[in-house]
Amino acid sequence: MSKKIITFSIIVLMSFLCFSCKDEVLPKPSSYLRLDYPEAEYANFETNHCPFTFEMNSEAVIKGENDCGFTVSYPKMKATIYLTYKPVNNNINKLLRDAQKLTYSHVIKADNILEQPYLNSNKKVFGMFYQVNGNAATNSQFYATDSTKHFVTGSVYFYAKPNFDSIMPAASYVKNDMRRLMETLKWK
């Protein structure tokens, strides 16, 4: 009888050890797709009816409007830069206030807004580049002016729910293009 109990105990103990040695099942963490984009190649963009030119990435698709407003689309990234032109008619303070108001309307969702002044005295282009960090609707905006005749604003939007971590590679790529656009802006 004791031999049966010992044998049974050993079998139970061995089966317990064999089946309890498995690794714990852990859920897979969420991950995001790694996105690589081609190196940007820039070309000058100019129209006959607008008083400015700029350089733009060859990956972008530019659609113009009669009032010198443009949409610069990145179909692969589901992103669009919206450019708006306004002539300055003794209203520079209002234009500046409106541009700043547009940027700071995102402060509710933004973690941080970095202001980076831009000044090119040779080309008479002055402005501000804004980098909006966090889950805001836009992650980059700018305005540029000569303060007497011309005023251009730009902002980038993604056709996706704003999740800063998941759109970061595309947002960084488009932000660099938008900065290049602002820095190559020339008045006619």
What are these regions (language model features)?
Residues 1-10:
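Bacterial N-terminal signal peptides that target proteins for export
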Residues 155-188:
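Surface-exposed amphipathic alpha-helical segments
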Residues 100-155:
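Signature of long, low-cysteine stretches enriched in small and polar/charged residues
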Residues 81-89, 141-142, 164-172:
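Second-shell loop/turn segments in exported
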Residues 22-25:
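Bacterial signal peptide processing site
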Residues 29-49:
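Post-signal peptide N-terminal segment of mature Sec-exported envelope proteins
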Residues 48-102:
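Secretory pathway targeting signatures of secreted, lumenal, and periplasmic proteins
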Residues 16-20:
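C-terminal motif of bacterial Sec signal peptides marking the signal peptidase cleavage site
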